Amino acid sequence: MHIAEKGLPSEKSIRIQFNESIINGNKLGNLDLIAIPLASTLNELKQRDINIFYRTVDQNMLPKEEQIEYFAAIEDITFIGYPSGLYDNVNKLPIIRQGITATPIWNQFNGENVFLIDAGVFPGSSGSPVFIYNHGSYPTKDGIAIGNRLLFIGVISETMIRNEADAKSYLDLGKVIGSKVMYEEVTNFIQRINKV
């Protein structure tokens, strides 16, 4: 984790090690995701006068049903992550990439709670948050709308690979777990840990 100085990431970082029981015990329902409660870790670091730089995505960034109704079948997407562990080590920033939806967000690809994106999705992309980000104008099912959009639509869970006899080839496609079902499972998880 990057240490914050004056509200910005510094060149300093701190490694936080989680034991396997935390990882194995925090699966989000049937999704290929886990949740790691960080409040106690962040509080402990704060008591040691160590401030961690982080950003959050709150539920206000999730698309509402009436917004989803106007999504186009093909939407521009932006995702943020560390493909193959790559990041800007000097500025302590992840890599931002863009692409399009390869299947409509509102459909369940092959009956799963996922949709596909067509972008530079490589190993190490799993866990990357995916957003619809439009500046100036954006498509709707009825035409074009003027304005800006920033909506959290999911998290990459898998890189799509074609296995061939002598090699694997990356299809530049990724599976994305939709933010709505993810939020429902996070809510269930929070209720479960609050009972303990």
Question: Where do the protein language model's features map onto the residues?
Answer:
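Serine endopeptidase catalytic core focused on the charge-relay Asp
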Residues: 1-112, 118-119, 123, 127, ...
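C-terminal cap/linker of serine protease catalytic domains
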Residues: 136-196
